């Protein structure tokens, strides 16, 4: 979730001229709603659970997809009832890089730096929700690093 917050802020900062600085992450209502709230995975998951039963939903983390693209794509294809052949979806067994930073008119934005206070505040907000999400999707609570 912390890396997702960084990525989302960089994406938004590269497109939105008046995007607040990263140190305003929890002070800016716009950043808090758009970036931090979007990182409350269990809360987001539950919004879909109101409409769809658990067996009709599949959760794959970015880490799983990046580390094991073939296995993850086969799992996705099988889940949707498609033939689990992902050979045409990958480039030399890896996910294709199609949306490089700076493409589509976005500025190249450097990775932000967390102050210790900001990082701890963000962790205090998102970690309990993240752990509920991990438990509800059958993953260990130490799936994500918080350092």
Regions found by a protein language model. Name each.
Residues 36, 46-131, 139-147:
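The conserved 3'-phosphoadenosine-5'-phosphosulfate
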Residues 2, 26, 73-74, 134:
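Generic structural signal for individual residues within well-ordered alpha-helical segments
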Residues 43:
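Active-site glycine-rich loop that binds ribose-phosphate moieties when present
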